[in-house]
Regions:
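Short, conserved charged micro-motifs
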Residues: 162-165, 245-250, 287
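Signature of N6-adenine DNA methyltransferases within the class I
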Residues: 1-129, 146-147, 160-164, 222, ...
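Short Ser/Thr-interspersed hydrophobic loop/turn segments at strand-loop and sheet-helix junctions
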Residues: 138, 179, 203-221, 243-265
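Short, flexible loop/turn elements at secondary-structure junctions
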Residues: 1-2, 29, 50-52, 143, ...
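Short coil/turn segments at secondary-structure boundaries
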Residues: 59-61, 133, 149-154, 183-194, ...
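Structural beta-strand/beta-sheet cores of well-ordered domains, especially the beta-sheet scaffolds
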Residues: 41-44, 58, 135-137, 149-151, ...
Length: 287
C-alpha cells in the first residue's frame, strides 16, 4: 500500500525534495508462501537511490498475480510506479470540476452485528411487533455484487418506550452497548450511551447510486445500482445522492476504471474506492 493512494501521494514530494529516484520496481504481485494456511499477500519491490546517474530505469509488470514478471524500460518511475516524470494527483477537498455531485460513504454501525438482521434471523425479528416497525433493507457491497439480502434495525426515530418494551430491541441494544464499551476508540466508547444509533450516520434522503468500495480488478467496470432512501447505505458502500445520468455513464466507463486502477488503493489486488473527492477528476483516491 506504500505505492498506492495517499501513501504514494505523500511519498512523491519527499523523494523529489531529497533527490531520491526509483531505479527499478516490481508492480503488485502475489507473494508465494509454503505455509498451508498462508494468507494472500500482495506486494511490490522498489529499489531507489540518492542522486542516481542517467540511464534507463527498469519496471516489471505482472499479467497474472502469480505469473512471471514482464520487464519494460522506463525513463523515470514515480511513486505510483508509473513511467512518467509527473507526480501523482494532488489531494483535494473538493472536485476540480465545479458542479460534480458529492460522493459519501455509507453509515457505520460498529455493533458486532447486533443492529443487523440476516435472512435467517428475519422471521424472528419480524415477529416482534415493535422491532418489526424499525426493520429496513441494509445494503453493503455484497448486496450489489452478490444480491445479498440483509436488513438493519434503523432506530433513528425510535422512542425510549419502544426500545425498552421490545425484547428483541432490548437484548440487541444491550449487546451493542457492551461491544462499544470495550472499544479502544474514544468516540466508539462514548457511543455506548446511544446503542440504538449507528456510530457514523450518513443516510441519503432521496434516491442514490450505490457504489461498492471494494470490487474485483478483473471487472471492466465497477457494478453499481440505484436505490431508494428506504434502503440504508452501509459503510462498505460509497453513494451519490440524486446522481445525474451523465455521471453514472462516466462511472461505468473505461476511463473511470483505469483511473481507480492507477490511483486508488487496493484490498489485496481488488479496487478500493474512497469518497474523499481527492482526485483531480472525481472522488476516488484515498484508501
Amino acid at each position: 500500500s506504500l505505492m498506492q493512494g495517499d501513501s504514494a501521494r505523500a511519498l512523491d514530494p519527499i523523494f523529489r525534495a531529497t533527490a531520491n529516484e526509483i531505479l527499478f520496481a516490481h508492480r503488485s504481485f502475489q507473494w508465494d508462501t509454503e505455509a498451508s494456511d498462508g494468507a494472500a499477500v500482495y506486494c511490490v519491490i522498489v529499489g531507489f537511490s540518492f542522486a542516481p546517474g542517467p540511464g534507463a530505469r527498469r519496471l516489471f509488470d505482472y499479467d497474472k498475480a502469480k505469473g512471471d514478471p514482464r520487464e519494460q524500460a522506463a525513463r523515470r518511475i514515480n511513486c505510483y510506479l508509473i513511467d512518467t516524470e509527473l507526480p501523482g494527483p494532488a489531494k483535494r477537498s473538493t472536485p476540480l470540476l465545479a458542479g460534480l455531485p458529492a460522493m459519501s460513504k455509507g453509515s457505520q454501525p460498529t455493533d458486532k452485528g447486533n443492529l443487523l438482521v440476516k435472512l435467517e434471523q428475519y422471521d424472528e425479528v419480524a415477529a416482534d411487533p415493535i422491532a418489526a416497525t424499525y426493520l429496513a433493507p441494509w445494503a453493503q457491497s455484497a448486496a450489489i455484487l452478490d444480491n445479498e439480502k440483509k436488513w438493519c434495525l434503523w432506530l433513528v426515530d425510535s422512542t425510549a418506550q419502544d426500545r425498552e418494551e421490545s425484547p428483541i430491541l432490548a437484548k440487541r441494544l444491550a449487546a451493542v452497548a457492551e461491544t462499544r464499551k470495550e472499544s479502544p476508540t474514544p468516540s466508539v466508547k462514548a457511543a455506548a450511551r446511544t446503542p440504538w444509533l449507528f456510530t457514523q450516520l450518513r443516510q441519503p434522503t432521496s434516491r442514490w447510486l450505490a457504489i461498492p468500495r471494494h470490487s474485483s480488478e478483473h471487472r471492466i467496470c465497477v457494478p453499481m445500482m440505484e436505490l431508494g432512501p428506504e434502503t440504508i447505505a452501509g459503510d462498505a458502500l460509497a453513494y451519490i445522492e440524486n446522481c445525474p445520468a451523465w455521471v453514472f455513464v462516466y462511472l461505468q466507463s473505461a476511463a473511470f476504471t483505469d483511473w481507480i486502477r492507477t490511483f486508488s488503493g487496493a484490498l489485496e489486488s481488488r479496487f478500493r474506492i474512497s469518497p474523499d473527492r481527492s482526485s483531480p477528476v472525481t472522488w476516488c483516491s484515498d484508501r
